[in-house]
């Protein structure tokens, strides 16, 4: 009978969304998470499709890349929800530390959502301001503090997974991205100044125009659909994008709207409905920018673990060397292979450790 560790089953994350722990700081009613069903899937985004849509105007898609034998390498790509008529700051998808409060309209969020957003942008001062505001609640000591602490700990655990400096981080590091080819490199500098969570989000949401694998280059697209500038990740190319957001409401029914929209009218012949039998080409705006280089070799250092026979041979060699008379000097030998030197060094270190 196989034994299964209890920690592996009880501590498994059931929600990989950074907003998954958000709940009102009022314990009077039960609260269900608004996260979309994909929050249970560890797809590397660490934010569900719902929150990615309403906060960063991006929905998830997959980019299947087939090879010569029919095998498919799947890569995620974000779908822009920015309409072609949108102008100005409303075209910013992922803002920077300098403008995220205005772009994300932070004042319209609840205190719990504000706290998570400040944690994403690593704004410690703003996090403290939210905690001070919570202290005015009469139930702060008995209930509110416990809820805030639980939400903070769960959100911190998700954010830690996106930090490449963390031990055993889940962020993929076997690739390199080049965002721009100009000498100024504004896109690269802005990207490096982003917090770890947003750097990972941009990496998984923005697919490359070109993918370099060993000596092969796959040209997926020959022009970008977005850009990274001083305001963040921006859908700067005004492509026709009539997409309807799956989760966001685009208008308020209580407010009168006057629209000037494009409309097609005509019979089946005029609209060429007979062509609907063919495979449709979707009019969407995938986020694509720069070049990605995939490293096919392992990023971890390879080494050989010594066996029991190796240690026995080492003991015999050590005892024979101590009993034998000194040998005459031999001619200098050629350089030994690096793998052999590393293997012998491992055995010697183990022998010194045993002799202590």
UniProtKB/Swiss-Prot annotation:
Misc. remarks from the entry: Expressed late in infection.
Main location: virion
Family: Belongs to the baculoviridae p39 family.
Disulfide bonds: none
Keyword Transmembrane helix in record: no
Underlying gene: P39
Keyword terms: Capsid protein, Late protein, Virion
Subcellular location: Virion
Source taxon at top rank: Viruses
Xref: InterPro entries: Baculo_VP39 (IPR007589)
Matches recorded under Pfam families: Baculo_VP39
Gene Ontology molecular function, alphabetical: structural molecule activity
Name of the protein in its database record: Major capsid protein
This protein's GO CC annotations: viral capsid
